[in-house]
Design a protein with these regions (language model features):
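Helix-turn-helix
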Residues: 1-19, 23
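Gram-positive cell-envelope targeting signals
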Residues: 5-12, 80, 87, 98, ...
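Hydrophobic alpha-helical connector segments
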Residues: 23, 38-74
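Short, basic, alpha-helical segments at the C-terminal edge of helix-turn-helix-like DNA-binding modules
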Residues: 26-33
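Short alpha-helix boundary/capping elements
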Residues: 62-65, 76-80, 141-148
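Short, hydrophobic secondary-structure boundary micro-motifs
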Residues: 69-71, 80, 131, 156
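Amphipathic alpha-helical packing segments from all-alpha helical-bundle domains
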Residues: 78-124
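C-terminal peripheral helix-coil segments that are non-catalytic and often amphipathic
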Residues: 109-125, 129, 133-179
Length: 179
């Protein structure tokens, strides 16, 4: 009020509270990026990288389900690509130190497309069959979304550790189906 603004002023810049939350949630990606940078190394096979990316992603998303659901599955998640590109223009150091594959994943805001670069490398290395890759990616994204929504709906009744373990049993099953 002292600055001459009130809560209605926010709606000159954002469609509603959920869009404002989307913008403010980007900051949570910094912690995820730092942890990812510490876990990934360029000597990893693509399948190891993919597993590590998801271990870090699941850890952060299950700990902050409201934030990650808003970012990747919320009402305005379609705006995330524009927001992320702008964010990395302003804060390029946040992506420094990531491998090329993880950089391409981080820049890709559409959760359904973000795994494509690492999946292509997995196909090249023989870890996944090309014709099965799109189904594996889609299944993993949908299962993650489902688990995230379960946490949002039943936070008090759910053990996050147990939820993570169940998710990774399915994840490992999908990746090791042909091996």
């Amino acid at each position: 009020d002292k600055a001459g603004y009130n809560t209605a002023t926010i709606y000159n810049y954002f469609e509603d509270l959920e869009e404002l939350i989307l913008y403010s949630s980007i900051d949570y990606l910094k912690i995820y990026l730092k942890d990812l940078r510490n876990e990934i190394n360029s000597d990893m096979k693509a399948i190891e990288m993919y597993e590590t990316i998801y271990k870090v992603f699941v850890h952060h998303s299950f700990e902050k389900p409201e934030i990650f659901h808003t970012l990747f599955f919320g009402k305005y998640s379609y705006k995330l690509e524009k927001i992320i590109k702008k964010y990395y223009e302003i804060f390029p150091d946040d992506i420094t130190g990531q491998t090329d594959i993880t950089k391409s994943i981080l820049i890709e805001a559409d959760i359904h497309n973000r795994d494509i670069p690492v999946m292509k490398q997995m196909i090249k290395e023989g870890s996944v069959l090309e014709e099965e890759a799109p189904y594996i990616m889609e299944a993993i994204v949908r299962i993650h979304q489902s688990y995230l929504e379960n946490i949002l709906q039943q936070r008090e009744q759910i053990s996050l550790e147990e939820h993570k373990n169940k998710f990774f049993k399915i994840f490992d099953f999908l990746l090791n189906f042909n091996n």
